[in-house]
């Protein structure tokens, strides 16, 4: 049946500068071409006011809110002994505070209407660890914990909250230098070829499924939608197999 969507992208360059509506608007146009309805937003989730602005826009444009998905992110990779407070804080503000700034105002609506779906974005970097990403890993593991708590708080109101740990090429991940990729290469072993997962299109169905009635029993979980690689570290981690995906029981 489709959905009415607020597409939010602050439109910044990788260095954090700029506020271009182009990235959000291009997605809006793609949705419109497929017969859907969408509007663009360039609010910054790094501020509580920006997060509320996104939620308010959904209510103003479409009259209700049923789902929030919070994939906003930036990278400021640096070894801990070289990392500045600004590099630390920028990543925490966008990822962790950014998740809170959207979920908090949405939760009030969901609690009142006794329904809603929340899908946040964690990462292997937080759950397992990548060198050079103490800021990113802390934020992403924080999102996993945040999501589990929100799930407990809102579950009794008919609301589910789950986190995805994805693996996909985006504007952000394309900025990772080859030297860094090589340094991390030993952390993973290749998955079976038929399980390769590389593009956002491969992750999107997991997000969509979590927002359906058939996933109403899934709450407070962290789901690995990251099948380009499987992690050695997961071998001893209790988890539930879900059609090739893994729900981490942490």
Positions of the model-derived regions?
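A glycine-rich helix->loop->beta "capping" turn
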Residues: 34-37, 57-70, 76, 115, ...
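Active-site helix of classical SDR
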Residues: 103, 139
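Active-site-adjacent segment of SDR/Rossmann-fold oxidoreductases
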Residues: 108-112, 128, 144, 149-159, ...
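The beta1-alpha1 cofactor-binding region of Rossmann-like NAD(H)/NADP(H)-dependent oxidoreductases
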Residues: 42-53, 85
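Substrate-binding pocket helix/loop in short-chain dehydrogenase/reductase
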Residues: 31, 79-80, 87-89
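Residue(s) in the substrate-gating loop at a strand-loop-helix junction
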Residues: 123
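Conserved small/polar residues in nucleotide/adenosyl-binding loops
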Residues: 229-236
